[in-house]
């Protein structure tokens, strides 16, 4: 996994550090991914506003594009996201992953490439390719993600 940019995520990490993920409504997906329901009174709007700075800095790399659909993904220790591809993703869209918390055993698998996405970096992911996550560590793996689309 090769990052395309460094990004300061300290304020986002500080904000999510006070969250008890078990308090958030969640969607339990196949493979055990914990996906907080982000559009709730429990704080997405506060978090979403904090992402504006990060998104603006990273969008400088994408001329003639706009950001679309911001998300937060949490994979708890010992849980995985099964191998899949996002069939509905259009060819002119890419996803930016911004790790907020991770560990050396939180693996991202994309086709036949496997690695750890490190906080403080931003990564491009073509979600039409087969991808999966396995968090074999003892801390949550939390990623802020957003899609980039051509205008």
Cite the ranges covered by each PLM segment:
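Short connector loops at helix/strand junctions that flank enzyme active sites
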Residues: 67, 76-78, 91-95, 101-103
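Conserved short histidine dyad/triad with adjacent acidic residue
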Residues: 72-90
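Short, surface-exposed charged micro-motifs
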Residues: 71-72, 97, 132
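A short hydrophobic beta-strand segment most commonly corresponding to one strand
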Residues: 93-99, 122-124, 138-151
């Amino acid at each position: 996994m090769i990052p395309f940019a460094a990004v300061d995520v300290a304020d986002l990490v500080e904000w999510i550090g006070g969250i008890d993920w078990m308090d958030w409504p969640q969607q339990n997906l196949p493979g055990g991914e914990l996906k907080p329901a982000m559009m709730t009174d429990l704080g997405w709007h506060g978090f979403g506003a904090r992402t504006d700075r990060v998104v603006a800095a990273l969008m400088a790399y994408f001329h003639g594009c706009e950001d679309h659909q911001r998300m937060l993904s949490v994979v708890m220790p010992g849980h995985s996201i099964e191998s899949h591809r996002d069939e509905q993703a259009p060819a002119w869209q890419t996803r930016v992953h911004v790790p907020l918390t991770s560990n050396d055993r939180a693996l991202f698998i994309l086709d036949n490439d496997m690695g750890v996405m490190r906080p403080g970096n931003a990564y491009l992911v073509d979600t039409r390719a087969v991808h999966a996550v396995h968090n074999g560590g003892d801390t949550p793996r939390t990623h802020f993600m957003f899609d980039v689309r051509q205008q």
